[in-house]
C-alpha cells in the first residue's frame, strides 16, 4: 500500500490500528490504563480508520463524519484512537441514525483560572532600588519593541557565520595517495564475501557516475569493503583521495572503522579513522573517516567549501531514514553541482530504490546478493493452524460461532417456511457475544450523550422478555401478524428493549422482518425509533437484502434512499484496504477471526511467543532463536517467563542461555551473544530492532517477529511527543526474516497475518516526518542560501515533512526568540545553532551563563538531551522502590529536575568512593547514561568556551559563571527560560492543571509530583491530592505525552509566578502589553458574568500584563509596572551578553543580576519552597580513562607529574593557577551565621597567606577537574583555604572513649583512622566547610560538633588513649554539649541505606541536608543543656 506523502498512516491505535498506542503501553510501557478494556475489531476496519484519521489530521478539514454502519465496538475504537491523537469525537443519534463525528481541537476553547502574582514587600523594594539606580533607558526600551523592518541580513549573516565556529566538525585535510594495504588474517574472509566478486564493477560504475546506489543484503560486506575498494583502486592508479563514510549509529562508526583498520593491518587513526560526537581518532594521514550523519552535517555548516577536498562521500544504511541522513542528502544533492569531482555513494540493505532514483535523477543501482540460506516464512494464520494454539477467549468465540451457525440454519427454515407451518417452540435465552456499549470501552467520561441500549444487549434482558420478543418476531414473519408490532413497540418503549433486538434463534431484527414482509409504515416507524439499517443477520443480510430477496420494491426504495442520506459525504476507505481475501482459506479466515476476537493484536502476545518457543525447543533442530520485541518491558516480561514463571523452561534453565539486546541496557550481552553456546544449550535472544542491522548473530536459525517497534514521534499538531508501539515496515520485516538464514536454512515466525503484512508501509516512516524539527530548522538557516525560507529548503528533502510541521517548528523558534518575524536567525539563534543540544535546552544553558548558575543547568540540560538516567526495574515488585528512590533525590523540592541533578551528584560521589555500580543498581540508575552525560557536559562546556561565554580567567571564568549555582530559585529561572512555552497553570477551584491547548493535564506516573507526600496508602483521588499539595500555581515540564486522551506531563518543577512573569514570553513585548486598570477589560466577558459585585470591583482595580496569547496576568498596577521594568532589564542584559559574550560585565549588568536573584529568592521563600543544599557542587574528580568514548578529552601524551595534572573539561591551566590563589571570604550557611553558631574569627585572615599543600600523587585526584592537587612548595606550609562555592560536608566521628574528646576540645586537634584520612583530606579540599559530629561509642549521645580547619598531617599525637590513629589535624569546636540520640531519631541518612544517623560507622558521611538538620538540633536543646563555646 503506498504511503500518503504527507504522513504515515501507521499511527497507532490505543486499542488497535496500526500500532499499540499510548494507552496500553504508554511511554515507558507497562499495562493498560486502569478501566480501559481491550477493543477487538477486524483488521480491515482498523487499517481503514487509521488512514482516514491521518488524512483528516493533516488536511484542512475541521470536522469529519464516520458512517452509521459502524458497530458500537468499532465506534469505541474510533473514539479511543481519536482521543489518543488529540481529536474530539462525539457519537450522536440513536440506532441506525447513530453516527460519529471527529473534530480538531481549537486552542481557544481552553478556559483557565485567573493568573495572578502578589509580590512581597522585599521584592518590590529590590526592584525599586534597581530601577531608581539604573532606570530602563530609551535604548533598552526601543531594542525590546517588536521589529518593524528587516535588518541587513547579508551583513549579519556573514558576521555570525564567521563567529559560529562550531565544534564537532571533521578536520580539513588534503587528498593523498593511500598507502598499500597490509596483509591480514581477514583476507580469506574478505574474499568470501558476496561484494568481493563485484569489486571491479563497483569501482568502474563509481568512476563513471556522480551518484551510485548500492543495495546489498545484510552480511554481503558492503559497509566494510566498498570504502576499501576505493582506497585500493586509488593506490593502484596513484590517484589522491579523501573519503567520508557516514553511519546512523555512533557504535557502528567506531566498530566499522576498527574492523576496516584491522583488515588493512593498520592502527586506528592512521589511514582509517573515525569521528563521532564525543570522540575522534584521526590524524593528518587519515583518508577514510567514518563518522555519524550529524558530524558531517555540522561540518557542512561551516560553508560549502568544506567538501572541496573530499573525493567520495558514502552514506551507509540509508534505509534507516533518520532526520540527519535525509537532511544530509538534501544538502549533498545541492553540493554535487558545486563540486564536480565529488562522488556520492548511497548504500543500504533495503533501499527505497525508486524514491532515490527519482531524487538523484536516474543514477545507476548495483545489487549485491547476500549469502543466506532459504528461510521458510510462517504468518499468524499458519502458526495458529500448524501449532494448534488456542486460548480461553478463542474457545469462547468458537462456541458463539456455533450458536451463529445454528441461527443461520433456523433463518433458512424461516425463509422457506410456509405460512402457519411453523409453531414457535419454547424460547430460550440467547447467549450471543456480549460486546459492551462503546462508552464502557472508553475511560471515564466518553461523550455521555449515549443513553440508548445497543443491539447487543440481549443478555441483560429477563427471560420472559426474550421469550415475548422472540414470539412476536416469529409471529410477524411466519404468520404476517401485523398486530404483533403493537406489542414490539410497547416492549421497546416501556421495557427498555433495544429497537435492534435480535431473535435469539435466527438473529433477525424487527426491521428485517418488517422489510421482508413489506410492512412499509412499520419500517418507517422503526427507522424513526432509531433502528440500525446496517445491522446484519447471522447470514450477513441487512434489512435491505431481506426486502430485495422477497421482492418488496417499495421497502427497497425506502431503505436505499435512507441509507444514501446517511452515507452522503462520508469517506469510503474500503478501497484503500487491500483485503485480498481470496488468498485466505475459510479455515484460516475463521482462525484469524477467532484470534483477533480473543487478543488485541495491537499489543504483543507473550503467551503465543511462549507457545512457539516451546514448540521450537521440543520439536526442532538445534539453533539459536532470535525474538524481535518492541521494547524493554516486553523483553524483561518474556525473560521472566522463560527463567522463572513458565515451568516448562524454568525447570530446565541449564538447557538455555537467554540474552537481552537493547540499546540502553546495562548488559554485556551484546558481546556475549556473538559467541557460540556449549553443546546441548540453545541460545534465546530477546532483542529490539537493534538486531535488524546493527548486530549480526551468525548462528540464528529461528526468528520470532512480533512485528512491532517502539518509535518516538512528535505530534506537531498538538505539540506532544509520543512513544508508540507501531507496526514495522515491510523492509524491516524482510530484514528480520533474513536473520534466520545465516548458517543454514531457517524459519521465520511472524505474529501478524498476511493481510497485515500486505498493508504495512514499504519502508519506515522517515524521522523527518515524525520528530520535532526546531533543531533542523536552525541548521537549515546555516545550510541554505541567505534568502531561502526554511520550508523551501526542506521541500527539497527526499520526502519533505508536511508544511504544517515545518510551520509549527519555525513558529516555535520564533516563540523562543531564535528567529525573527522574517525567519532570520537572531543573535540567540546563531548561538543555539552552535550548541549540540535542542534549541530550548541551548537557551536554558545560555540563560544559566548569564544568571551565573551554569553547573547544575549543564547537568540537567545534558540529562534532558540524552535520556532519563532512571531505569525501569527488572522486577515489577521493584517499581515502587524505584519511584521512592527518585522521590528521595528531590529532597522535597517539588521538582523532577532536582531528582536528575542530585542523582547525578550522588552517583559522582559514589564513583569517587569506588562503589558506583552498586549505587546504580540500588538506586535504579543507568551507569552508561551517567557516563554519557559527563561527556556531553564536557562538549557543551567546550563549545561555551569557544563562543566566549566561559572565559579562562577573571570575570566570566568557570567560578564566576557558578556564583549562584547553589541558589535553586535562580537555577529554576534558567529552567523556566528554556522550557517556555512548556507551562501549565493550576486551577485551584477545580483542582486541575491546564495548558495553552489542554483543558486538563495530568502528571505522568513517572513524575515525583504525581505522588503527594502521603506516608500511608495514597488517596483514591491521587491527582487532585497531588495538585492540592503544590505550593505554587505554576509548573514547567520537559515533555507532554499522550496516553489515551489525557495529556500527561513528565519531568516537572513547581515555580513561582514571578519567575514566569520575568522569564517567559518573547523578549520583545508590544507597547500595549501592560494595560492599566482604567483601560483594561476582559474581551468577550460581559460585565454581569461575575458572581458578585465585589469580584467585579476587585478585578477592575487590577492591571493586565499580557505576555503571549495565553499568559494574561492580572496584578496590582505598581507590581505590574515594576515587573515589566525588571523584565526589560533582564532581556536587555541577555541581549547584550548574546551580542558580546566575552565583553566584561558592567555595573548595570551586575546590579541587574543581583536584583533578579533577590526577587527570585524572596518569592521562592514566600511560596514555601525549600532550598536544598549542595546543588551547586562542581563535578567530582573522575578519571577520563574510565569513561567510554573519551579519547577526545585525553591528551595524546602520557600523564606527567602531579604538577602537570591534566585537568578536565572544566579546568584550564589558567584556572588551576587561580585555584591556588587566595580565596575570597567564605560564606557559611546563612542559618548558622545568623545564630552565631560558627566561630567568629572564621574568614580569610587566618588563611590568606596559605598557598599550598603537600604533593599528592595524581592518581588520587584523577581528571575531570574540580579538585586538582597543587604541587608542594616546601615542608611545613599551612593549608590553603577550602574552595568557596562548594558544598558543606558532614561526617560522623566515633570515639572509643570520652577522654579523647576532652583532649580535642582543650587542644583543638583530632586524629582519625588512616582509612578515613584520604576521604577527609579530599573533602577539606573540595568543600567550603567540613563539619565533624562526634559520638562516643555506647554513650547514646552525640557529644557536639566542630569544623575541620586544616588538612591531616603526618605528625601523630601521643595524647590519644587509642591505638591505630593517624596524623593530627586542627578542628574548631562549635558546640560541646551532648545531644541525646532520641532527638535525632527522625533523621535518616540516604548515604547509609537510609539508616538513622546515630547508626553510623566512624567516618560515615551524611547527606548535606541531613547533616544540616542534625546540626540545627543543638539549637533546640533545653537552655540548661546549652554550653556554646566561642
From Swiss-Prot:
Record CDD domains: DEXHc_YTHDC2, R3H_DEXH_helicase, SF2_C_RHA, YTH
GO terms classed as biological process: germline cell cycle switching, mitotic to meiotic cell cycle; meiotic cell cycle; oocyte development; spermatid development
Domain YTH as annotated: residue spans: 1288-1418
ANK repeat ranges, renumbered to this chain: 506-538, 539-571
Alphabetical keyword list: ANK repeat, ATP-binding, Cytoplasm, Differentiation, Helicase, Hydrolase, Meiosis, Nucleotide-binding, Oogenesis, Phosphoprotein, Repeat, RNA-binding, Spermatogenesis
An annotated Gene Ontology molecular function: N6-methyladenosine-containing RNA reader activity
EC identifiers of the protein: 3.6.4.13
Superkingdom to which the source organism belongs: Eukaryota
Helicase ATP-binding domain location: 203-369
Helicase C-terminal domain boundaries: 612-784
Binding of RNA, residues: 1294-1296, 1310, 1360
Cell compartments where the protein resides: Cytoplasm; Cytoplasm, Perinuclear region
Record's comment describing the protein's domains: The YTH domain mediates RNA-binding. It recognizes and binds N6-methyladenosine (m6A)-containing RNAs.
PANTHER family for this protein: 3'-5' RNA HELICASE YTHDC2, ATP-DEPENDENT RNA HELICASE
SUBUNIT field: Interacts with MEIOC; binds transcripts that regulate the mitotic cell cycle inhibiting progression into metaphase, thereby allowing meiotic prophase to proceed normally. Interacts (via ANK repeats) with XRN1. Interacts with ZCCHC4. Associates with the small ribosomal subunit. Interacts with RBM46.
Protein family membership: Belongs to the DEAD box helicase family. DEAH subfamily.
Role of this protein: 3'-5' RNA helicase that plays a key role in the male and female germline by promoting transition from mitotic to meiotic divisions in stem cells. Specifically recognizes and binds N6-methyladenosine (m6A)-containing RNAs, a modification present at internal sites of mRNAs and some non-coding RNAs that plays a role in the efficiency of RNA processing and stability. Essential for ensuring a successful progression of the meiotic program in the germline by regulating the level of m6A-containing RNAs.
Protein name: 3'-5' RNA helicase YTHDC2
Organism of derivation: Pongo abelii (Sumatran orangutan)
